Amino acid sequence: MSITIRELCNDTYHFVSKEIKIIIFISVLAAFISILINVLIKPNIHIISIIENKKFLSSHSIFDLINSMSIYEKKELLKYSIFKIFEFLISKTFLLGSIITLITHLSNHKKESIQFSLNSLCKFLPSLFILNFITTFFIQIGFMFFIFPGIFLSVLLALSPIILSFKKNNLIDCIRLSISISCKHLNIVGTSVLFWMCVKFILTTVFSNTYIISKNFIFLILNINMNIFFSILIVYLFRFYMLFLRS
């Protein structure tokens, strides 16, 4: 049984159009979680001003900029970086887990109660968080050296959360299987991940150059939009993996 991009796009479109209200609700909820974390843990204003003024970009090297900082500024930058990583991981884990649980709940022939699905989500989130931490770590290392290794790793590891949701493999096996399947179906997985990255880049560029509305509101709208598109990517990849298991 051959799997085509067109077939996957049609299946994804039908699912998303049918469940768009729930997807938007989950996306908004994930965006509010990011905002709540930002409100609860306020980073140093001076460090934020350095980043927002794009001094990182104007500097010849990030390492040169870090070396020119005082010990206090270095500590604050480290704290800010850790805070942003955990904010990203928490919101991503919640979004991923919620969308995967939604798909599993709707595609399960045995009708399960909402309470059962919520319990499954709560049990799934800790292992998903650890997996996201591992995959994000390797992807960021890839982006640190060159852009292409980071993009390539993003494609290879894209299926690992979906494989984990089937509860048949441990974390390492999920990563190994994701790499193996993605390499064999690079056109299907790679196209979707690259499309998501392009959408993310366009949205970030457009909203970061918008000065009419307040920054907090822009941050909220940007997060909601990115979460919706990321949810669509998850639906696409989940459908692909289901068809892959049947083939």
Curated annotation (Swiss-Prot):
InterPro entries in the cross-refs: UPF0259
Family under the similarity heading: Belongs to the UPF0259 family.
Taxonomic source organism: Buchnera aphidicola subsp. Schizaphis graminum (strain Sg)
Organism domain of life: Bacteria
Cell compartments where the protein resides: Cell membrane
Keyword Membrane: yes
Membrane topology type: Multi-pass membrane protein
Sorted UniProt keywords: Cell membrane, Membrane, Transmembrane, Transmembrane helix
One GO CC term, this protein: plasma membrane
NCBIfam families: PRK02868.1
Transmembrane segments: 20-40, 82-102, 114-134, 137-157, 188-208, 217-237
Protein name as annotated: UPF0259 membrane protein BUsg_265
Keyword Transmembrane helix: yes
